[in-house]
Amino acid sequence: MAIHLYKTSTPSTRNGAVDSQVKSNPRNNLIYGQHHCGKGRNARGIITAGHRGGGHKRLYRKIDFRRNEKDISGRIVTIEYDPNRNAYICLIHYGDGEKRYILHPRGAIIGDTIVSGTEVPISMGNALPLTDMPLGTAIHNIEITLGKGGQLARAAGAVAKLIAKEGKSATLRLPSGEVRLIYKNCLATVGQVGNVGVNQKNLGRAGSKCWLGKRPVVRGVAMNPVDHPHGGGEGRAPIGRKKPTTPWGYPALGRRSRKRNKYSDIYILRRRK
């Protein structure tokens, strides 16, 4: 990813560092509209996820997470920006005339060839079952349920590692540090997701943040007591509690949010960091 630094001509361009290399030119048969409703609200209109709302209109790009074009080679035609995710996507033209979007693997360029199947080379962008991969392979877009499509390691720069195979299961180390068992016939894509330097971008101004649908963040201590447990007081008062809390009074900053006794706990060998 090429980071573009602006010449300092205005306050908004002084700190801006954006990626201006990848453009978006989606195909009409692979996009459809989506109705954005809620803006962080639930069915009763109550805010459940803060700092969301507004933003530019988006068209959803249909991504092929299943990679079920078996044993048919495809060629990367374009690398495009997707407003619905922080990773890039690339358009694939398959030999049978099929055209699909997939997540852009790191290092893939226009003209490269990819293929999906059981006996395919262990090369970047190819999709194959975990049982056919050697130990230590870097992978992304990993299935949890066979045939459902990739659900793990799909964000920009995400990569998991195959560390063991035993019986019907394969052991993976996920980007979060979690070590987990996956059915070894599940499909995964070789390589790392592209756009690794996404965290190096600096939008430079509040307006660019608003285009992404992200509202301003206000500290709890700057609110009134009716709005936040940290609010109120005379001047710069402390929060008045032993530990910080969410706007709804639950413990914040480090409390684990995973449900207890979940059915998938038996597949997790080591929890995430």
Curated annotation (Swiss-Prot):
GO terms for cellular component: chloroplast; mitochondrial large ribosomal subunit. InterPro entries: NA-bd_OB-fold (IPR012340), Rib_uL2_dom2 (IPR014722), Ribosomal_uL2 (IPR002171), Ribosomal_uL2_bac/org-type (IPR005880), Ribosomal_uL2_C (IPR022669), Ribosomal_uL2_CS (IPR022671), Ribosomal_uL2_dom3 (IPR014726), Ribosomal_uL2_RNA-bd_dom (IPR022666). It holds the Pfam family Ribosomal_L2. GO terms for biological process: mitochondrial translation. It is found in: Plastid, Chloroplast. HAMAP family: Ribosomal_uL2_B (MF_01320_B). Part of the 50S ribosomal subunit. Belongs to the universal ribosomal protein uL2 family. Keywords: Chloroplast, Plastid, Ribonucleoprotein, Ribosomal protein. This is Large ribosomal subunit protein uL2cz/uL2cy. The lineage of its organism: Eukaryota, Viridiplantae, Streptophyta, Embryophyta, Tracheophyta. It comes from the Eukaryota. The keyword tRNA processing does not apply. Residues 1-22, 223-254 are annotated as: Disordered. PANTHER family: LARGE RIBOSOMAL SUBUNIT PROTEIN UL2M (PTHR13691:SF5), RIBOSOMAL PROTEIN L2 (PTHR13691). GO terms for molecular function: rRNA binding; structural constituent of ribosome; transferase activity. The keyword Coiled coil does not apply.
